[in-house]
Amino acid sequence: MNVLSCSINTLIKEGLYEISGVEVGQHFYWQIGGFQVHAQVLITSWVVIAILLGSAVLAIRNPQTIPTDGQNFFEFVLEFIRDVSKTQIGEEYGPWVPFIGTLFLFIFVSNWSGALLPWKIIQLPQGELAAPTNDINTTVALALLTSAAYFYAGLSKKGLGYFSKYIQPTPILLPINILEDFTKPLSLSFRLFGNILADELVVVVLVSLVPLVVPIPVMFLGLFTSGIQALIFATLAAAYIGESMEGHH
């Protein structure tokens, strides 16, 4: 009994020691000019982009009148993105389908790559490879693109009259309305970053403590929540664009 107890204690201590070695925020940098660039984020982002471009090429390489399974799948994805865009933006959704679709697919594949691709087997001098959306720089960049998109949508539809929304329904709300436009990208970026980072950390901790069986359901749950996060981001982006074009909150 004492031997069993000692073995369990040893396993727990070893697991905790491994967990203590898990570090968040370690980065491998490239020096480009006078700037430091997060190399691992670029590497994983390029892999995700290559997957998306490769899939698109395969989908449109030989289109059939009677769709094949692969063509059916991509047509279903396109219809889904069009429905999301139309629901949130309205009748003028057409020009925004490529943007919303790109956001959704990039985030979806990025999130899933963190669970399905063996990034950890590639050793870097510092830090490690992970899903692109595991890095706050990626999620902030996506959120800023969304902000630029809804400002462009509003200005292209209404011109400078777009800014009159900041004093509606009363000028007293001017500071709050301005603050709202700053909190939108913040909420988008931190929600996505926090969920993906937390999911990967939970899996790392469980694998360190219990290498078999137990982490598997958590990984499946992570895949599900990763897909939901991509949908939430794309839906909110479309809603913000529609809101800026309609001019109501």
From Swiss-Prot:
InterPro entries per the record? ATP_syn_F0_a_bact/chloroplast, ATP_synth_F0_asu, ATP_synth_F0_asu_AS, F0_ATP_A_sf
**Annotated GO CC locations:** chloroplast thylakoid membrane; plasma membrane; proton-transporting ATP synthase complex
Q: How does it sit in the membrane?
A: Multi-pass membrane protein
Location comes to: Plastid, Chloroplast thylakoid membrane
Q: Which family does it belong to?
A: Belongs to the ATPase A chain family.
> Which NCBIfam families does the UniProt record give?
ATP_synt_6_or_A
According to UniProt, the name of this protein is ATP synthase subunit a, chloroplastic
Gene that this sequence comes from: atpI
